[in-house]
């Protein structure tokens, strides 16, 4: 795992703001955090997830989600964590949502596809037609391993290859593979379209990997990343 500095609380600084509350109009996407357990411990993580965290959504709460989908009819269920795939109810929830015709997004860190017991995860996602939004903070091994831990880049590349082999990111497959970039340090992301072109060129040239789109995100100034900003 990546080496972590001492934690500092950034929440009190964020609470001192006149920024108005944001209210939705209609419910289009239901995002659900299934828990804080993760097989990685990234320096930028805004929920402080790690293999040591034990907090996971309880079964009673999980059972409510298909009922909410049926009652409110959002178009998309967006599953995140931690590593959402580590929740014992993950696959059952995916099946229940897809049975209702709800689009499912799995926010995947890629290395989870190589974990013991998860060997059939990628085929499961493909069989269910789940959209994969995969964390890939750089196309450089040094930058990825600095943020996410030694060896994470190589495992991420292997995860992408497995998804590509199943049709993810391939034209006409109907299986969507989008990547997510986030800054390495206290800075804003570069232009998304230019960065996407760089990713497509470098990943194809060096690893034969294809994907659909790249999202350039700004890190949330809370938990580990917030701590680095005030350190």
Describe each PLM feature range:
Residues 1-3, 126, 133, 140-231:
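Radical SAM enzyme [4Fe-4S]-AdoMet core and its adjacent flexible, acidic
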Residues 4-81, 85-102:
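Conserved alpha-helical substructure of the radical SAM core
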Residues 28-35, 43, 58, 66-68, ...:
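Generic ordered-secondary-structure signal
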Residues 29, 49-57, 72-87, 98-117, ...:
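Core AdoMet radical
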Residues 45-47, 58-60, 92, 119, ...:
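Surface-exposed beta-strand edges and their flanking turn/coil or helix-capping segments
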Residues 61-70, 93-98, 102-104, 117-119, ...:
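Amphipathic repeat-derived elements
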Residues 64-67, 89-99, 120-123, 155-158, ...:
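Alpha-helical scaffolding segments of alpha/beta enzyme cores, especially the outer helices
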């Amino acid at each position: 795992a990546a080496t972590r500095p001492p934690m500092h609380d950034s929440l009190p600084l964020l609470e001192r703001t006149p920024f108005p509350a944001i209210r939705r109009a209609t419910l289009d996407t239901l995002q659900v955090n299934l828990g804080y357990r993760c097989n990685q411990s990234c320096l930028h993580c805004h929920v402080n997830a790690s293999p040591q965290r034990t907090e996971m959504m309880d079964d009673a709460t999980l059972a409510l989600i298909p009922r909410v989908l049926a009652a409110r009819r959002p178009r998309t269920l967006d599953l995140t964590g931690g590593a959402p795939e580590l929740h014992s109810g993950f696959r059952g929830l995916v099946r229940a949502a897809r049975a209702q015709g709800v689009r499912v997004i799995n926010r995947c860190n890629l290395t989870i596809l190589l974990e013991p017991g998860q060997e059939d995860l990628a085929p499961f996602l493909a069989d269910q037609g789940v959209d994969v939004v995969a964390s890939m903070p750089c196309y450089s091994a040094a930058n990825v391993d600095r943020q996410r831990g030694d060896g994470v880049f190589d495992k991420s590349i292997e995860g992408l290859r497995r998804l590509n082999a199943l049709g993810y990111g391939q034209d006409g497959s109907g299986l969507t593979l989008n990547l997510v970039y986030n800054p390495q340090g206290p800075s804003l992301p570069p232009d998304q379209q230019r960065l996407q072109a760089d990713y497509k060129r470098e990943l194809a040239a060096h690893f034969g990997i294809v994907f659909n789109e790249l999202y350039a995100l700004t890190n949330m100034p809370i938990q580990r990343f917030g701590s680095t900003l005030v350190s």
